């Protein structure tokens, strides 16, 4: 007989696979190889991993989580976005907070675009909650997009993040990598 814990985990996994399958294989109206388009609204969701770069005593500390953003492409080469991420610490003790929750707004610039995908430069500023304590936030990175299906894109992004810019003597620095899906 299965224990309730395993039933819950199995049910959660099955529902995740079902939802992702519907998102990926559902039908849309148009295909976009690049997210850039005039007056184009989009939504994205991703899973992310984050590694600390500069905090003494935090060697081997990884954060994991995900995020969502709403983006609006003003022209084919320039867009703005609003987003929020959530990261949970892999260790229960150490100098870094147990959870990090950045809220940000930023710019997206399309660097390269082709029939199969595009490369965007992204940069964001905002506020972050570290265990509920407010601080400043900055990130910059690259996002590689490829066509997934009609009006959907798969993307990989890599970002450099700073937590505590201008408020801490040495801001926490992280590098993150994420995989996600954008809808237009």
Describe the function of each predicted region.
Residues 1-38, 184:
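Cleavable N-terminal export/targeting peptides
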Residues 12, 17-27, 55, 64, ...:
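Generic detector of low-complexity/intrinsically disordered segments
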Residues 47-51, 85-88, 126, 159-161:
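Generic short beta-strand segments
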Residues 26-74, 80, 86, 174-184:
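Short glycine/proline- and aromatic-enriched beta-strand/turn motifs that initiate or cap beta-hairpins
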Residues 155-166:
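Low-complexity, intrinsically disordered Gly/Pro/Thr-rich segments
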Residues 42-44, 136, 160:
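Ser/Thr- (and often Asn-) enriched beta-sheet segments in non-cytosolic proteins
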Residues 67-154, 182-184:
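Gram-negative (and chloroplast) outer-membrane scaffold detector with strong preference
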Residues 36-38, 57-63, 96-102, 131-137, ...:
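Transmembrane beta-barrel outer-membrane domains
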